[in-house]
C-alpha cells in the first residue's frame, strides 16, 4: 500500500482536565491551532499523547473526537499499539470505523517479540483489523525496549502486511533511518521524529 503523508505531522498531546479525565472539548482547539499553523495532520494517542496511561475506552473517545473536529485535508493518524493484542485490534477497527486516515502501532512493551518475523506477525494481526487504512510500524526502541532491525522487519513484512505503508521512526540511528528511506526504491513512507 503506497499512501504518503505530506507536510508536518504533529505527535499531539492529549488534553486533560484537572481531575485527570480526558478533556475531549479541547481537542477541537488543538486541531484548529494545528491547522492555523500549517500543520497537515496529527499522530494521536502516541507517546506524546500518553496512550499507555489511557484506557482503551478513552483512546477510542479521543479518536472519535479527533476525526469529528479535524479540519478538511487534515490527516488523523491513530496510534493503536497496546500490550494486549485484542485491545490493539479493537482500537484499529474503531479507528477505521471512525474515519481516521491511518493507524500505527509499536511493539508490545512487556512480552516483546524477539525477531522480525514475530514483530511482523503481531503487526499483521493489528493491521488486518483495519484493512482499508494505511499502517505504520511505530519504531521507538527507547520506549519499548524492542530494537529489531527495521530493514529485517521490512523484508519480513513482504507479502504478509499488505497495508504497511511506512515507519514512524523514533530512534537516533540515522543510518538505519536512511536505509529505511531507500529500502525497495523508497517504497515506504518514513516519518522521523524524536524527542531529546
Language model regions located:
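Catalytic alpha/beta core domains of metabolic enzymes, predominantly
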Residues: 127-131, 140-196
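Active-site beta->alpha loop and helix N-cap motifs at the rims of alpha/beta catalytic domains
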Residues: 2-146
Amino acid at each position: 500500500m503506497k499512501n504518503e503523508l505530506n507536510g508536518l505531522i504533529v505527535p499531539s498531546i492529549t488534553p486533560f482536565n484537572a481531575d485527570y479525565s480526558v478533556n475531549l472539548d479541547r481537542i477541537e482547539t488543538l486541531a484548529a491551532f494545528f491547522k492555523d499553523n500549517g500543520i497537515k495532520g496529527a499522530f494521536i494517542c502516541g507517546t506524546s499523547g500518553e496512550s499507555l496511561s489511557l484506557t482503551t475506552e478513552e483512546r477510542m473517545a479521543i479518536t472519535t473526537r479527533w476525526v469529528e473536529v479535524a479540519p478538511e485535508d487534515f490527516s488523523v493518524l491513530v496510534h493503536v499499539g497496546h500490550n494486549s493484542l485484542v485491545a490493539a485490534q479493537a482500537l484499529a477497527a474503531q479507528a477505521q470505523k471512525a474515519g481516521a486516515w491511518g493507524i500505527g502501532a509499536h511493539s508490545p512493551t512487556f512480552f516483546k517479540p524477539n525477531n522480525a518475523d514475530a514483530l511482523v506477525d503481531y503487526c499483521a494481526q493489528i493491521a488486518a483489523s483495519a484493512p482499508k487504512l494505511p499502517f505504520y510500524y511505530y519504531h521507538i526502541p527507547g520506549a519499548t525496549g524492542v530494537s529489531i532491525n527495521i530493514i529485517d522487519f521490512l523484508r519480513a513484512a513482504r507479502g504478509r502486511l499488505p497495508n504497511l505503508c511506512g515507519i514512524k521512526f523514533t530512534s537516533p540511528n540515522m543510518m538505519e533511518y536512511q536505509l529505511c528511506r531507500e529500502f525497495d526504491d523508497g517504497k515506504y513512507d518514513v516519518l522521523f521524529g524524536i524527542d531529546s
